[in-house]
């Protein structure tokens, strides 16, 4: 059975049709695998390495379904680290049985690192590559979720609430300084939304930047938002402009190398 078929079979056991968030995660996983195939096609990888990267994509969010069942939320800070839960599920099941012990650990370690602020130190070169690939593929696909799905489900905050809030100084300065934003630094719902823009600064591959810029999902929510405070709207637009300038500058540097 193909890995995606096995994943869909596993996910279907949680889907009784009453919670649309199950479908959301299935679609997200399919999008991540599509992006992963684009990223691996742009690199000189062996067929086996492409397969391992694909498995990282298919199974990276497998912990989401049990998370939702137990805690009724996808928000890790209100429940459990879904990546670590997913690794437990993968270890207990037969999802990776066809792999060697070393390959299993490479895939599991990459999945365990996909939602961290930064990748853990000390990984071997191959595992580090898989971790970078799944982090990029996930972020590229998350922008679509952010733009198109119910923001209360995906971020915990509605557009109405966010439009009345401000961007905290630390979040604003992090975007201008090209830093990833720590969860504890976010003080408002708008901070949570703006923190998605900081994904740009953690993308590892030029192809990832091209995908995100072409999609345009990263700015869609903000362009549709009704801001109560014009100064806040200006701050958000500055954040968007800064991330775009950063991305295009990196791509120009890549072309020169």
Predicted features by range, described:
Residues 65-106, 117:
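Hydrophobic/aromatic-rich structural module bridging two neighboring secondary-structure elements via a short loop
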Residues 1-84, 124:
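Acidic/His-rich, divalent-metal-binding segments that scaffold phosphate/diphosphate chemistry
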Residues 8-14, 64-68, 93-98, 149-156:
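Short low-complexity stretches enriched in small and charged residues
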Residues 22-30, 34-46, 59, 70, ...:
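Divalent metal-dependent phosphate-bond-processing catalytic cores, especially two-metal-ion Mg2+/Mn2+ enzymes
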Residues 2, 45, 99-102, 231:
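Short coil/turn linker and secondary-structure boundary residues
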Residues 46-59, 101-110, 127-133:
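Alpha-helical scaffolds flanking conserved acidic
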């Amino acid at each position: 059975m193909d890995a995606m078929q096995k994943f869909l079979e596993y996910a279907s056991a949680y889907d009784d049709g009453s919670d649309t968030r199950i479908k959301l995660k299935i679609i997200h996983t399919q999008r991540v695998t599509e992006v992963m195939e684009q990223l691996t096609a742009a690199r000189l990888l062996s067929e086996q390495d492409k397969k391992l990267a694909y498995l990282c994509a298919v199974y990276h969010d497998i912990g989401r379904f049990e998370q939702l069942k137990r805690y009724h939320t996808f928000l890790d800070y209100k429940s459990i680290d879904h990546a670590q839960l997913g690794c437990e599920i993968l270890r207990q099941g037969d999802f990776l049985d066809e792999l060697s012990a070393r390959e299993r650990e490479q895939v599991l370690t990459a999945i365990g690192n996909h939602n961290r602020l930064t990748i853990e130190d000390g990984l071997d070169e191959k595992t580090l590559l898989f971790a970078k690939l799944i982090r990029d593929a996930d972020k590229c696909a998350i922008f679509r979720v952010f733009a198109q799905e119910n923001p209360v489900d995906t971020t915990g905050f509605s557009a109405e609430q966010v439009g009345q809030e401000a961007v905290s100084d630390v979040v604003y300065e992090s975007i201008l300084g090209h830093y990833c934003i720590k969860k504890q630094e976010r003080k408002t719902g708008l901070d949570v939304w703006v923190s998605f823009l900081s994904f740009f600064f953690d993308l590892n591959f030029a192809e990832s930047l091209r995908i995100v810029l072409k999609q345009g999902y990263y700015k869609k929510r903000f362009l549709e938002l009704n801001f109560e405070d014009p100064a806040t709207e200006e701050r958000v637009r500055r954040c968007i402009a800064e991330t775009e300038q950063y991305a295009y500058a990196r791509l120009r540097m890549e072309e020169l190398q």
